[in-house]
Amino acid sequence: MSQESDNNKRLVALVPMPSDPPFNTRRAYTSEDEAWKSYLENPLTAATKAMMSINGDEDSAAALGLLYDYYKVPRDKRLLSVSKASDSQEDQDKRNCLGTSEAQINLSGGENRVQVLKTVPVNLCLSQDHMENSKREQYSVSITESSAVIPVSGITVVKAEDFTPVFMAPPVHYPRADSEEQRVVIFEQTQYDLPSIASHSSYLKDDQRSTPDSTYSESFKDGASEKFRSTSVGADEYTYDQTGSGTFQYTLEATKSLRQKQGEGPMTYLNKGQFYAITLSETGDNKCFRHPISKVRSVVMVVFSEDKNRDEQLKYWKYWHSRQHTAKQRVLDIADYKESFNTIGNIEEIAYNAVSFTWDVNEEAKIFITVNCLSTDFSSQKGVKGLPLMIQIDTYSYNNRSNKPIHRAYCQIKVFCDKGAERKIRDEERKQNRKKGKGQASQAQCNNSSDGKMAAIPLQKKSDITYFKTMPDLHSQPVLFIPDVHFANLQRTGQVYYNTDDEREGSSVLVKRMFRPMEEEFGPTPSKQIKEENVKRVLLYVRKENDDVFDALMLKSPTVKGLMEALSEKYGLPVEKITKLYKKSKKGILVNMDDNIIEHYSNEDTFILNMESMVEGFKITLMEI
């Protein structure tokens, strides 16, 4: 139904909708008195209300009854506290969204104040104290996308469950009368996934309230940080938020030494070549959240204690590497156990003493590592005390492009051979038991004069799990050992290649900055150069077509030049006279000989040598047998 008045009158429409909420209304204002006078002459009768009730429209009948009762009161006697809305553009910009799911509000009767709500479907309920004094059965109105005129008393505290910010269409500004005042509905939000429920007072400051149209909280204007991000934040914009140095916890499943020194990190005994489990987890304030982007990168490394500078550490590592039976021997290895690979990804051997991997802080990560060096491997003298080593773990934010870790922890280790860790623990237990017996005997003598009871002396207990100690220093760079040997599975001297496509550029920058080319400062190790040259030599067996015995051609370098020098030395051909060099396969394919064929496909192969004299020089063809 609708009616149009004079110039000072406005069109008001009440439209019942067929959706779940039985009654939707357009936004109404207090300046519509003249528009309602004609309807007051024909009030709702009991028969009309009964007919509407039969048709299942009790809420519409109740709402119309409230409106009729309201407009029967003269305008000058009403208690109206709806203020004039500001016409400034700033207020219009603030009218964004206020979203939740499916609205239902319980109203109290007998009052004649007007409350205007603008919202998308929310799940609303009055506070307990207000519900006890209200007549919910008589005046229950469901509010959906449209606005409703609702009589309430005072300031109504409303509780919103499962609050989720949404974005609405640009707001439309409606002018209000001069006598209107601003009214407020205070939303008390139930915070999900939080250990404690924050009261609605935490969102207000000095009893100030914002209008329902505003999505800006007063507490955010004074510099306070908001607790929830908008759903429009993309994955690339998210940076893992660390709350302090105690965010992460690492444990090593190895026997802890019984002789721990005060002020130093935990000491653990390991056996060389034996795998031990390391567990990584998050234990800080962020643990109660399910992070949307929660991947971090951790680097596990074996380093020397802090009293050794970079040059000393590299000197020790080079000495150890020169005494190994193979140049591929690593200081630290990670096992390819299924239990480990289910919790980590993107594993990289970034250095001989370090491995890198990514893991999800929402889940506990577990890796298995082994240390391949002894504590006494860094000196040629026998009987010297071994150097203390450390297992250090640096954790970096996955999307952050800084080379500064967000957390760092370490554990001291001593590495023994042939079950030496167990023998060391047994020796410490025997020494501790002897001290315990002596202590109890002396304590008994002291207490015999009093009550004859012996006081127990606190002793260190054996523990099979060692907790890493957090390091406050996050700025110093660890020393990563990368010898001057090229291997396909090793990313060396800052050249980092990732195995998956979802890696971020920030992580690559992080790893590149962590180590420097050693040959720039120290040069390659001579012993390694000799071994490398021995591996690169190529041996070929050749004979002429009419010969029965093969000649051996030893190439000093696996190149075309090396082959030409070997032919010149064996058959007396000037190197500069060899103009063409071909290889003919068993299938009869003739190809130009190049360095790649000689190095990778010709070692210890047999060929028939064919030499043709030409004007410009010799044409040599090696036919594969």
Swiss-Prot record:
Where does the record place the Grh/CP2 DB domain? 244-482
Offer one example of a GO biological process linked to this entry. Answer: cell junction assembly
Q: Name one GO molecular function term.
A: identical protein binding
From the UniProt entry, list the residue stretches annotated as the region Transcription activation.
Answer: 1-93
Biased composition (Polar residues) is annotated at 440-451
**Where along the sequence does the record put site: Important for activation of transcription?**
R423
Family annotation (Pfam families): CP2 (PF04516), GRHL1_C (PF25416)
Q: Which PROSITE patterns match?
A: GRH_CP2_DB (PS51968)
| Knockout consequences | Mutant embryos show an epithelial and anterior and posterior neural tube defects leading to death at around 11.5 dpc. They exhibit a fully penetrant split-face malformation, associated with cranioschisis. Closure of the remainder of the neural tube ocrurred normally with the exception of the posterior neuropore. The dorso-lateral hinge points fail to form and closure do not proceed beyond this point.
Record-level GO cellular component terms: cell-cell junction; membrane; nucleoplasm; nucleus
The entry's localization annotation reads:
Nucleus; Membrane
Q: Which keywords, in A-to-Z order, does the entry hold?
A: Activator, DNA-binding, Membrane, Nucleus, Transcription, Transcription regulation
List every stretch annotated Disordered.
198-222, 428-452
InterPro entries associated with the record: CP2, TF_CP2-like
Q: Which PANTHER family match?
A: GRAINYHEAD-LIKE PROTEIN 2 HOMOLOG, TRANSCRIPTION FACTOR CP2
Give the family this protein belongs to, as stated in its UniProt record. Answer: Belongs to the grh/CP2 family. Grainyhead subfamily.
Remaining remarks: GRHL genes (GRHL1, GRHL2 and GRHL3) show a paradoxal lack of redundancy despite their extensive sequence identity in the DNA-binding and protein dimerization domains and the fact that the core consensus DNA binding sites are identical. They have related but remarkably different functions during embryogenesis because of their differential spatiotemporal expression patterns during development.
Its job: Transcription factor playing an important role in primary neurulation and in epithelial development. Binds directly to the consensus DNA sequence 5'-AACCGGTT-3' acting as an activator and repressor on distinct target genes. During embryogenesis, plays unique and cooperative roles with GRHL3 in establishing distinct zones of primary neurulation. Essential for closure 3 (rostral end of the forebrain), functions cooperatively with GRHL3 in closure 2 (forebrain/midbrain boundary) and posterior neuropore closure.
| Quaternary assembly | Homodimer, also forms heterodimers with GRHL1 or GRHL3.
- According to UniProt, the name of this protein is Grainyhead-like protein 2 homolog
Protein's organism? Mus musculus (Mouse)
Which gene is annotated as encoding this protein in its UniProt record?
Grhl2
